[in-house]
From Swiss-Prot:
This protein's name: ClpXP adapter protein SpxH
Pfam families: Thioredoxin_5
Taxonomic classification: Bacteria, Bacillati, Bacillota, Bacilli, Bacillales
Subcellular location as annotated: Cytoplasm
Principal subcellular localization: cytoplasm
Amino acid sequence: MDKQEAKHINMPSPSTCEHKSVEAYLFIDPLCKDCWEIEPFIIKLWLEYGKYFSIRHIVTGKVDGTNASSHKWNKPANIRFVWEKTTSLHGFSCDGKVHMQEASSTPYLVSMAIKAAELQGRKAGSKFLRKLQEYIFLENVSNPDCELLLACAKDSDIDVEEFKKDLYSASAKKAFQCDLKFTNEMHITEIPSLVFFHANSDEEGIKIAGTYSYDVYVQLLKELVKCEIEPEPLPPLEVLLEATQFISSKEVAFIYDCSKQEIERELKKLQLKRKVQMIDVKCERYWKWIAKEKDLV
């Protein structure tokens, strides 16, 4: 989700704090389930505090320690290593922590595909990544091939022809190499990991490895912003569903801090209005947005 969605999602209004004063980097492996299950935390954080920070997904991989540059954030002294473990919370994290040296490396083509989608914008890249993870974890696709990647591009509503050109392009390759280099510079040894920096400060950044309670991420953001910040009201349920297109009852319940029973009562009302389709996958209930934009009020 980015600024382009402002017409659908009520973006935060200006405040006394500096706009987008924090830069966040989420280090992921698209084949790691924990990296998929952290997404509800990121969505909720963005909806409530998105005016204070920007976020980028960084695709990790095997990196060479000799490639690190002399960037001001490269030195370990400039990153405060906060929590280095993964905790199972809210029923999302299910496989425990995944150390870089133990994880199987993501196929090169998959990483290139994510970068190719991002060449059409961060919003396009995020939509493509989410669709790819749905195929991997809900359809049991362990090694996505070119055909599936093209299907993800189509399902994500990005320019498929442009995606085909970019898939093997020098631009996508360079973008992926930059991700690998940055992963090395930040000394990422566990995924998912979040690194926060103040955009206009030489102060140390904060790294949090693994998955924690939502309040932890909010507290870290407040610490970096250095002024009182207040959450924006969450958007109406229909707006969230249109923005995400496909989301589980569990994710929606987490975002709105409600029980699954409460959320599903509201979702079933939308189902009766033919705005969503209910899909049961792996003992979990998902909801697909099927209404046209003109149906929204």
